[in-house]
Amino acid sequence: MQDSILLNQVLLTFTNSFKEHREDLSAVMLTDKKYLWLGSDETSSIERLCWDNHNFAQHKQFRVAEYIDLPAPEEEEIDIEGIDYSGYYLWIVGSHSWKRKKPKPDKSDSKNIKRLTKVESEPNRYILARIPLVDGELQKSCTHPQDSNVQLTASKLEVTQQGNLLMEALADDPHLGFFVKAEIPGKDNGFDIEGITVYQNRIFMGLRGPVLRGWAVMLEIEVESSQTGVLRLKNISEEGRQYKKHFMFLNGLGIRDLCVHGEDLLILAGPTMDLDGPVQLYCLPGGVHLQENVLHSPELVQKIPYGNREDHAEGITLAQDLFGEPSLLVVYDSPAKARLVDDGGVIADIFKLG
């Protein structure tokens, strides 16, 4: 294990209208032709930047509501916590979490204490969706570029009273069901998805929480189309469940993002509670081919720097296409003020990988 080696920094330049949200980036994915796709945990849109003279610019925003039907008005955030690309689809996942109101400096102690009693959830947070992505543009529906007999269609996991089919399936899970039914907020070690990666037909989602006696949890699912625009879960578990659970020892940390590297899984790990760090990068060899009911101990690869109430690493994506050597691009929530450039820019880091 080593400290991170900073190879480079790149400027991400957004339009002025996105100025405030450059400080709450929560998901990132670099696709071919050097498009950078990003999500914020405070919006219901997907952002695209283009590689331009060793930085990312030419910001274009895609409203998710233009591609799939949201269960609530788009003014209510999806809380996008993961983005990935596979098979001409861009995948996004919301946090699937409850949230607790936080104290505000302009309110009295008594009012802030009362705020800490209030927990809520929002229907848009339970979005797991895939949107066709062809030639750098999102589409609601289009013909598969390599097979004219296949139609690509924007779809989401079926919505239910419990949020969606995944939450319905997890409600009786012996490890996670209590957290789901008790409606424990994500930052209180409650159920909270942060990170998605897709390998062939398998979808992996990392849980920031709950962390169970020091063990983090990763979910694996497979989906199928049941009707236009709707996805359902397949039965994939040996026990007949619609999901698999994989337990990871990450030194007591939760999962903050996932990334496929060949057939290995890179895991960005950080605190499940409202803490600055530690933040660490792990590698799980052969992580896309995991058996159930096995405890895994991924290899600690390197530490990721973090700040004092700032610079919280939230998203990772492979970046070797940018500078020609194995590397990882990292974006931060609550970036340090030194990272903010003009009215729309924020600096991301490129770390050496391997």
Label the predicted regions.
Residues 1-354:
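Sequence/structural signature of beta-propeller domains
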